[in-house]
Design a protein with these regions (language model features):
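Generic C-terminal helix-cap and adjacent flexible tail
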Residues: 159-167
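Short, hydrophobic secondary-structure boundary micro-motifs
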Residues: 74-77, 85, 113, 145, ...
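Helix-turn-helix
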Residues: 1-24, 28
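Alpha-helical structural segments
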Residues: 7, 24-47, 53-64, 75, ...
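Amphipathic alpha-helical interface segments
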Residues: 61, 65, 69, 128-135, ...
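Short coil/turn helix-boundary motifs
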Residues: 47-51, 69, 111, 139-140, ...
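Amphipathic alpha-helical segments used for helix-helix packing
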Residues: 66-87, 101-105, 134-138
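Amphipathic alpha-helical packing segments from all-alpha helical-bundle domains
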Residues: 35-38, 57, 84-109, 116-130, ...
């Protein structure tokens, strides 16, 4: 808050008054980060692209956001209040999973698989990429391109060999 006040050349009480307190300011920050990440992911989930490109672009979109908004991502995954009425990382992942679900259902139909399983696979896929993103937040020994390539390798090669009935 002190940095914001100094940058805006106003006092801290003015900031608190404008946002209704620390919680209001924090909610604005979280909302801004959720919107930035969602915009990047929505652009990557363009259904006019080939499925492998959607996968790679989505992984890179998350990793690029983490790279350029490290503090914002850290707030989303670690510091955001659990009872926040504003957007949250988990609600964002749920929204992304719904978009992925529609893409997978279409692909499942083409592969003669039951599209009723698309919601489950969407959750697994989004969860995998989200967890890798959280890991990469602290472990930057690989470039985002290398990480995305390995995610694509695991997911794509696994998805290509799916069986209609895994039992």
């Amino acid at each position: 808050v002190e940095e914001i006040a100094a940058h805006a050349k106003i006092s801290k009480p003015v900031i608190y008054e404008h946002f209704g307190g620390k919680e209001g300011l924090y909610a604005v920050i979280v909302d801004r980060e959720v919107q930035a990440l969602m915009s990047a992911l929505e652009a990557a989930l363009d259904s006019h692209k080939r499925p492998r490109m959607i996968l790679e672009d989505s992984a890179l979109a998350l990793l690029s956001y983490i790279e350029s908004h490290t503090d914002g991502f850290r707030i989303l995954v670690r510091d955001a209040p659990q009872n926040s009425t504003s957007g949250s990382y988990s609600s964002l992942l749920g929204d992304v999973a719904i978009k992925v679900e529609h893409l997978l259902a279409e692909q499942f139909s083409h592969a003669h698989m039951d599209p009723k399983w698309a919601p489950l696979y969407a959750q697994m896929l989004v969860g995998l990429i989200a967890q890798v993103g959280q890991w990469w937040l602290d472990e930057r020994r690989m470039s985002k391109e290398e990480v995305a390539s390995h995610v694509v390798n695991l997911v794509w090669n696994g998805m290509r060999n799916l069986r209609p009935s895994p039992v």
